[in-house]
Amino acid sequence: MNEKLRVSSEVHFAQAADRFERSSMSKQLALLPNELFPLLTLDKNQHWLDFGAGTGALSVPLADQVGQVTALDTSAAMLAKLADKKVPNISILKHDIFCGLKQSYSGVISSMALHHVADIPELLRCLHQCLKKGGQLALVDLYSEDGSFHGDNAGKGVEHLGFDPQQLLELAAQAGFKALSYREIFWLKHRNGRDYPLFLLQGHA
């Protein structure tokens, strides 16, 4: 992402933080854990990383299921909203994952963040490196779409118009992940009148 687009994206997320949780999309995504968590192995001895955590749509319910959650994002405004919720076993981390992580995690979870990252192969390598051996990967994002989901794609920091999950699976395999699979997991109803499917990509380090 060039500097102009990077700044535009940062401004978008800063402005969006106040209204994000009131949006229709956010309210719909609040139901995602009901579909996602039963597909994972979760217990109180685990420490999970929520990549692109935003205001905590996954981090907060996940914290009820595991021992510790690290909520990672590059948006200070989004993370401030999450910090205000004062969930004791959520650690807030404003950090660029490409700079590396010191902690090793039991699992990495992410929802609707991948399409904002330009270098997906490198991201997958970083996620693999931060997982313990056998650690779980659970990534949720849009199937390939025509650009209508976000509309102002450049202004909203969109790097990919969704994904072909088979291609993403192959990239994850190249990054070192094993036992990979994907499935349709959720649909989002957009204000434009269209429905957009989401997939879940799962694997193990």
Regions found by a protein language model. Give the residues of each.
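Conserved class I S-adenosyl-L-methionine
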Residues: 1-41, 58, 78-81
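A short glycine-rich, Lys/Arg-flanked "PGG" loop and its adjoining helix->strand segment in the class I
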Residues: 122-133
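Class I SAM-dependent methyltransferase SAM/SAH-binding core
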Residues: 49-99
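A conserved beta-strand element that flanks and buttresses the S-adenosyl-L-methionine
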Residues: 109
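Short catalytic micro-motifs in class I SAM-dependent methyltransferases
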Residues: 112-113
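C-terminal alpha-helical "lid/dimerization" subdomain adjacent to the S-adenosyl-L-methionine
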Residues: 3-5, 21-27, 58, 138-195, ...
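Short glycine-centered segments of the SAM/dcSAM-binding site in methyltransferase folds
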Residues: 47, 134-136
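C-terminal lobe and adjacent flexible extensions of AdoMet/dcAdoMet transferase-like proteins
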Residues: 201-205
